[in-house]
Amino acid sequence: MPTIHYHISDLRVALRPYRTAQRIALVPTMGNLHDGHLELVKIAKQHADIVVVSIFVNPTQFGVGEDFDSYPRTLDEDVAKLAMVGADYVFAPTIDEMYPVLPPPTTILAGTITEQLCGKTRPNHFDGVGIVVSKLFNIVQPNIAVFGQKDYQQLAIIKQLVRDLSYSIDIIGAPIIRATDGLALSSRNQYLSESERQTAPILQQELQYSAKQISDNKQPLEVLLTAAHERITSAGFIIDYLEVKTTELTAVDDESINNHQDLVILVAAWLGRARLLDNRLVTINKV
């Protein structure tokens, strides 16, 4: 079983012997772990000697009316799952341990990259992500950290944060893990009713179809995205966004599309109580 620490000072003492000759990996999570999280741990073990998994439902990244209070807390089950994949340490701090003052007087503002996509409807979300990830980096001082590519914008922001703040940490983006029907695994999938769960894979099917159309580059992006938006909406989703970006999350249009080898199509959509995220990388077929 992994060793559980609840206090910053205890975790630092536990990790001190490894810092000289061994590599430490961090896998930050909010708990309620599924196979996607466990895959992050497996990847971390391939790149490091010691794997630390943080489990902390971070209040600073939730907005008013979001699901902070109802977000599942399943620490005992999570630790049992982490034991099966060989995690070494679990860091499960309280809110008071992480934030002596809440909201914290110090903030991390990641700039314009946060103002698009999820940032449009969750305006303070990535500020909260920035502060908690920075704190975890300072507490654990890992050599590597592993994040899932499902949260594509978050991954891009964390890479920027590491670069801008000169952290000596290698960031690994892990591929999206999907259910057998293609739905991207997410802790919030459990909010789906039985009928909604049957509908949910349509989201990735539409992404896959649209990615192929973008790759072939045979019709304007606006036409393609409008048609996809209509199909997704008619299936019962409420779309937050459906956009095509460069892999660095800069804007792209029909005039500039051939300047890029790779793009990404990203979607966030509500289905009942569940806000689902997904994305697909797109390689442009050059004529």
UniProtKB/Swiss-Prot annotation:
The record's CDD domains line, in alphabetical order, gives: PanC (cd00560)
Q: Which positions does UniProt annotate for ATP binding? A: 30-37, 148-151, 177, 185-188
Which positions does UniProt annotate for beta-alanine binding?
A: Q61
> Which keywords belong to this entry?
ATP-binding, Cytoplasm, Ligase, Nucleotide-binding, Pantothenate biosynthesis
Biochemical pathway: Cofactor biosynthesis; (R)-pantothenate biosynthesis; (R)-pantothenate from (R)-pantoate and beta-alanine: step 1/1
Enzyme Commission code(s) on record: 6.3.2.1
What InterPro entries does its record include?
Cyt_trans-like (IPR004821), Pantoate_ligase (IPR003721), Pantoate_ligase_C (IPR042176), Rossmann-like_a/b/a_fold (IPR014729)
GO cellular component terms attached to this protein's record: cytosol
Keyword Cytoplasm among record annotations: yes
Question: Where's the active site on this chain?
Answer: H37 (proton donor)
Name its cellular compartments: Cytoplasm
Give a GO biological-process term.
pantothenate biosynthetic process
What is the enzyme's main class? ligase
Q: Which residues bind (R)-pantoate?
A: Q61, Q154
- Enumerate the Pfam families for this protein: Pantoate_ligase (PF02569)
Q: Where is the signal peptide?
A: none
Main location class? cytoplasm
Query: What highest taxon heads this organism's lineage?
Result: Bacteria
Gene Ontology MF terms? ATP binding; pantoate-beta-alanine ligase activity
The note filed under miscellaneous reads:
The reaction proceeds by a bi uni uni bi ping pong mechanism.
Q: Which family does it belong to?
A: Belongs to the pantothenate synthetase family.
The record describes the protein's role as: Catalyzes the condensation of pantoate with beta-alanine in an ATP-dependent reaction via a pantoyl-adenylate intermediate.
UniProt subunit comment: Homodimer.
The protein here is known as Pantothenate synthetase
Taxonomy of the source species: Bacteria, Pseudomonadati, Pseudomonadota, Gammaproteobacteria, Moraxellales
